[in-house]
């Protein structure tokens, strides 16, 4: 047994539950007929090989559990399941979440009585406990009173608690009626009948499990040597070696090894009438489609009042808000460290457990996060997906691209029309324009300086409080600003991203780079002028020394 796949995102939780319920109901409608023909849990189950099951991720296994439990509950509601299948018992246990192997024979109830009144009424409820069974027997005795089955129900009531200890007594009355009434079949892959009912203390009946270890498995896989009891199961297994996927899902063109998996997934997505005209993705509710369309239109309706940053989705906006409020609701129980997102806490916990679940198939190296593994894999493949839009240079890691972009930032081509200040990127210019358009409503109570954003005021306040939240792990030195901290880290890493085009000399910080560039002009350029007396200097340090005089 294994599970069907699904790719629903976290924003579709409520819709997914409705879709699973509809899928379960649709499968039951196909199974239940007007004349109450035999239906079992086996009719609405999805069978897979162990290889297929092990390839599914936790979300896909959880979807399988929800659908199968829904199917079983619906069957029980209309009375088509007498004994709880072992699969359901397994799904309800916590071993399911641990991904343990699933190998269960399925039980099928067959009702062979000719009393249609009892057949329709006795099977109305899920007869899985002694009390429910007793209620069903009483109801059956009322319906069948005066018929050839009347004596049968008289013998059944009351159910004795010592049935199991009295094998000689025939508690079910006429043995012929007992055989006609209840026959439980346990089937293997070839459909052979393997066992019948005996009595149990809990329900009055329990399946007598005959050993299947001796069953012949005459179909052996030539690739791995695994044996199967039927040709069809061998063929399905062999597709795991060949990669053949015969069953295609029409909506996205995805293929599956098992036909029932393809059918179930198509059923789960059948009720999605709201389709995206851009990519064809379907949604059950128009609200979900509207949210999805933002990925195509670029609409970002959620704007932060603190910094002006905009977001597509409300949950992203809420998480961003914590960067301003300082809220960190997810706390590590081991060390007390707090995080703004649950994913951050999950990754941090691995530092305590030593768990590195993401391993490289090429060299075996393991990583805490999938993003680190992806970056590492690029060292094997040579992939460089991060490309500079200005010069076309490509990088394997986004942080390397960001460092490279700082070189272009010195080329200040985007100029402010109000004050003449220039910027390397249009986005930086747009942020700067807010300083002209917005009111400086955040004022420092210490010195009276005003700021556009509360975050800028918080950074400024560190001058007065002496707070230095950025501490170097290498040497312990602390800084009040992140930019100063980043520049300091380069003294340990040796990174020098600012390179002179004239002589090739590289520098850690942009200020040193600008001072060096002046040395190549061979002029007495003195861009740093004193506002008090007008005296000019070629270096900012000289200007600062001069200003002390005033």
Swiss-Prot record:
GO terms for cellular component: nucleus. Residues 39-110 form the KRAB domain. GO terms for biological process: regulation of DNA-templated transcription. InterPro entries: KRAB, KRAB_dom_sf, Zinc_finger, Znf_C2H2_sf, Znf_C2H2_type. Keywords: DNA-binding, Metal-binding, Nucleus, Repeat, Transcription, Transcription regulation, Zinc, Zinc-finger. Pfam families: KRAB (PF01352), zf-C2H2 (PF00096), zf-H2C2_2 (PF13465). It is found in: Nucleus. PROSITE patterns: KRAB, ZINC_FINGER_C2H2_1, ZINC_FINGER_C2H2_2. One of its GO terms (molecular function) is DNA binding. A zinc finger (C2H2-type) spans 219-241, 274-296, 302-324, 330-352, 358-380, 386-408, 414-436, 442-464, 470-492, 498-522, 528-550. May be involved in transcriptional regulation. This is Zinc finger protein 426. It comes from Mus musculus (Mouse). The lineage of its organism: Eukaryota, Metazoa, Chordata, Craniata, Vertebrata.
């Amino acid at each position: 047994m294994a599970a069907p796949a699904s790719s629903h995102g976290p924003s579709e939780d409520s819709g997914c539950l409705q879709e699973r319920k509809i899928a379960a109901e649709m499968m039951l409608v196909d199974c239940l007929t007007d004349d109450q023909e035999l239906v079992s849990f086996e009719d609405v189950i999805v069978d897979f090989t162990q290889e297929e099951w092990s390839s599914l991720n936790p979300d896909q296994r959880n979807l399988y559990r929800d659908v199968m439990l829904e199917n079983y509950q619906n069957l029980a509601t209309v009375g088509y399941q007498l004994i709880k299948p072992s699969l359901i018992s397994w799904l309800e246990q916590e071993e399911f979440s641990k991904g343990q192997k699933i190998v269960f024979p399925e039980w099928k109830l067959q009702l062979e009585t000719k009393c249609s009144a009892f057949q329709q009424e006795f099977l109305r409820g899920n007869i899985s406990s002694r009390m429910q069974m007793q209620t069903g027997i009483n109801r059956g005795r009322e319906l069948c009173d005066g018929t050839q089955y009347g004596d049968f129900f008289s013998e059944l009531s009351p159910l004795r608690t010592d049935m199991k200890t009295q094998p000689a007594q025939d508690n079910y009355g006429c043995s012929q009626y007992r055989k006609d009434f209840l026959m439980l079949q346990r089937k293997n892959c070839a459909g052979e009948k393997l066992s019948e009912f005996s009595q149990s203390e809990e329900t009055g009946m329990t399946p007598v499990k005959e050993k299947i270890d001796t069953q012949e498995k005459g179909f052996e896989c030539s690739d791995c040597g695994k044996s199967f009891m039927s040709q069809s199961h061998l063929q399905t297994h062999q597709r795991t070696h060949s990669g053949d996927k015969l069953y295609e899902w029409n909506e996205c063109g995805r293929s599956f090894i098992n036909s029932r998996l393809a059918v179930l997934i198509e059923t789960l997505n059948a009720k999605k009438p709201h389709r995206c005209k851009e990519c064809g993705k379907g949604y059950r509710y128009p609200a979900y489609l509207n949210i999805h369309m933002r990925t195509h239109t670029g609409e970002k309706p959620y704007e932060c009042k603190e910094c002006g940053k905009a977001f597509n989705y409300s949950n992203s906006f809420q998480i961003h808000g914590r960067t301003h409020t300082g809220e960190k609701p997810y706390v590590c129980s081991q060390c007390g460290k707090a995080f703004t997102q649950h994913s951050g806490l999950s990754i941090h916990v691995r530092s305590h457990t030593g768990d590195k679940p993401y391993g490289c198939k090429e060299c075996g190296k393991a990583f805490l996060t999938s993003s680190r593994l992806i970056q590492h894999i690029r060292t094997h493949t040579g992939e460089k997906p991060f490309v500079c839009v200005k010069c076309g240079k490509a990088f394997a890691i986004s942080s390397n691209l960001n460092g490279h972009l700082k070189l272009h930032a010195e080329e200040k081509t985007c100029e402010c029309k109000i004050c003449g200040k220039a910027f390397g990127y249009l986005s930086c210019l747009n942020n700067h324009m807010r300083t002209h358009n917005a009111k400086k409503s955040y004022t420092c109570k210490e010195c009276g300086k005003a700021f556009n954003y509360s975050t800028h005021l918080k950074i400024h306040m560190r001058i007065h409080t002496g707070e230095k939240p950025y501490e170097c792990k290498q040497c312990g030195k602390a800084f009040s600003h992140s930019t100063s901290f980043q520049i300091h880290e380069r003294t340990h890493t040796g990174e020098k991203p600012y390179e002179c085009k004239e002589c090739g000399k590289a520098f850690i910080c942009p200020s040193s780079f600008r001072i060096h560039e002046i040395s190549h002009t061979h002029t007495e350029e003195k861009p740093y002028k004193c506002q008090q007396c007008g005296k000019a200097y070629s270096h900012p340090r000289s200007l600062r020394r001069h200003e002390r005089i005033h």
